[in-house]
């Protein structure tokens, strides 16, 4: 399922100051949409022929931040329940963050944005980024990786020298083009799909 989530209509600076108490309002709309979507997938799993215990999230850039958010903020719904879809778990079973942003607060110790409090219950995570990403620098993934490792969460990270930002699924001559196969292999190693 593809989620097109709501974003705040406020003026937004993509070079966001992610430090706590930065004076910027935090919107819960994207996270609410992610929580609701996972609930709907689980509610309709039999009807849609999907395994309710193999539901994951994948996001690019700001969507990568949403991946981290739903992976760490799933204990309670941020909205009033609508129906039975909101009674089950909205914790993803795995997470893939591709050049995620807004995870590192910019310090020298790679402190994680406090809006993504990693715990042992955070799902297994795959991170991917290019070192020459000028939008969301590699420190975003590194900070999240360190927090996941400290919490004992299974995590795999791949850094590429070239690829920039927003390489997505485009075929290029760069090694980063092969990242979907790495994710597929990883999904097999964590039991989400049959191992190759």
Predicted regions and their residues:
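Acidic beta-to-alpha connecting loop that harbors the catalytic carboxylate
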Residues: 101, 131-134, 162-164
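Conserved alpha/beta-hydrolase "acid-adjacent" motif
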Residues: 134-140
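Loop/turn elements at helix/coil->beta-strand transitions in domains of secreted/extracellular proteins
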Residues: 1, 52-54, 91-94, 122-125, ...
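Alpha/beta-hydrolase-fold catalytic nucleophile elbow
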Residues: 4, 58, 96-99, 128, ...
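Primarily recognizes the serine-hydrolase "nucleophile elbow" in alpha/beta-hydrolase
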Residues: 29-120
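C-terminal catalytic histidine-bearing segment of alpha/beta-hydrolase fold enzymes
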Residues: 142-196
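Short beta-strand/loop motif that positions the catalytic acidic residue
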Residues: 121, 127-129, 133
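Serine-hydrolase catalytic machinery in alpha/beta-hydrolase-like enzymes
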Residues: 1-50, 164, 169-175
């Amino acid at each position: 399922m593809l989620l097109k989530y709501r974003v705040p209509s406020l003026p937004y600076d993509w070079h966001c100051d992610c430090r706590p108490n930065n004076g910027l309002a935090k919107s819960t709309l994207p996270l609410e949409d992610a929580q609701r979507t996972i609930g709907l997938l689980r509610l309709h799993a039999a009807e849609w022929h999907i395994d309710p215990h193999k539901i994951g999230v994948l996001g690019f850039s700001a969507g990568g931040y949403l991946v981290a958010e739903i992976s760490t903020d799933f204990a309670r719904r941020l909205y009033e329940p609508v129906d039975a879809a909101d009674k089950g778990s909205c914790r993803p079973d795995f997470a893939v963050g591709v050049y995620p942003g807004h995870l590192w607060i910019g310090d020298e110790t790679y402190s994680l944005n406090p809006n993504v409090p990693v715990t042992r219950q955070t799902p297994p995570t795959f991170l991917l980024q290019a070192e020459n990403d000028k939008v969301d620098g590699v420190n975003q993934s590194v900070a999240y990786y360190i927090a996941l490792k400290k919490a004992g969460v299974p995590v795999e990270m791949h850094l590429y020298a070239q690829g920039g930002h927003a390489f997505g699924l485009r075929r290029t001559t760069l090694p980063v083009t092969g990242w979907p196969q790495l994710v597929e292999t990883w999904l097999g190693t964590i039991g989400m799909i049959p191992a190759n």
